[in-house]
């Protein structure tokens, strides 16, 4: 059955949103894996665990916001299999933050590609939606993760275990 509310919503935009939903769910899944890795008794970095759990919830919320947008515009949701995270063991806090930084950059690039598709199909509503709810937040997240990677390296991580402990306690534990 065709949507009654669909207007100025190109099939390419609809398909790109479905791909972005999948990527946001993959990011959520990856962060959830990181969170419970750092919660293990042999890793025991609760600040990292809490931070990655929050990131997982935020990425899931991003996916849900896109699902709602798809319905509001009269698009159809086609969920795909969510890929398993690239690893099960995340190593040090520095290793995990470097993975998170790359993940956020990948999500950002995908959002920029999505914005380009909606611009090419003259969809100002979708462009505004992405600019308002996603693009600025992504840039801020990338900057924060980059700063944290720099600070951990400056403290001597991953060779210096005390560096990660103090970062966990004082930066992530606030």
Curated annotation (Swiss-Prot):
Its EC number is 1.16.3.1. Signal peptide: none annotated. Fe cation 1 binds at residues 24, 59, 62. Liver (at protein level). One of its GO terms (cellular component) is cytoplasm. Residues 7-156 form the Ferritin-like diiron domain. SUPFAM superfamilies: Ferritin-like. PROSITE patterns: FERRITIN_1, FERRITIN_2, FERRITIN_LIKE. Transmembrane segments: none annotated. GO terms for biological process: intracellular iron ion homeostasis; iron ion transport; negative regulation of ferroptosis. Fe cation 2 binds at residues 59, 104, 138. It comes from the Eukaryota. Stores iron in a soluble, non-toxic, readily available form. Important for iron homeostasis. Has ferroxidase activity. Iron is taken up in the ferrous form and deposited as ferric hydroxides after oxidation. Also plays a role in delivery of iron to cells. Mediates iron uptake in capsule cells of the developing kidney. Delivery to lysosomes is mediated by the cargo receptor NCOA4 for autophagic degradation and release of iron. PANTHER family: FERRITIN, FERRITIN HEAVY CHAIN. This is Ferritin, heavy subunit. The lineage of its organism: Eukaryota, Metazoa, Chordata, Craniata, Vertebrata.
């Amino acid at each position: 059955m065709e949507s009654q509310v669909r207007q100025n919503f190109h099939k390419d935009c609809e398909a790109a949103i479905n791909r972005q939903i999948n990527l946001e769910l993959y990011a959520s899944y990856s962060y959830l894996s990181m969170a419970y890795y750092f919660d293990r008794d042999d890793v025991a970095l609760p600040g990292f665990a809490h931070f990655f759990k929050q990131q997982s919830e935020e990425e899931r919320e991003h996916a849900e916001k896109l699902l709602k947008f798809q319905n509001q515009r009269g698009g159809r949701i086609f969920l795909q299999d969510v890929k398993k995270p690239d690893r099960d063991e995340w190593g040090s806090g520095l290793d995990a933050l470097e993975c998170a930084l790359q993940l956020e950059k990948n999500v950002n690039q995908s959002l920029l590609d999505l914005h380009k598709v909606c611009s090419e199909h003259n969809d100002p509503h979708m462009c505004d939606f992405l600019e308002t709810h996603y693009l600025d937040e992504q840039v801020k997240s990338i900057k924060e993760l980059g700063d944290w990677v720099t600070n951990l390296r400056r403290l001597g991580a991953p060779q210096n275990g005390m560096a990660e402990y103090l970062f966990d306690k004082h930066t992530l534990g606030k």
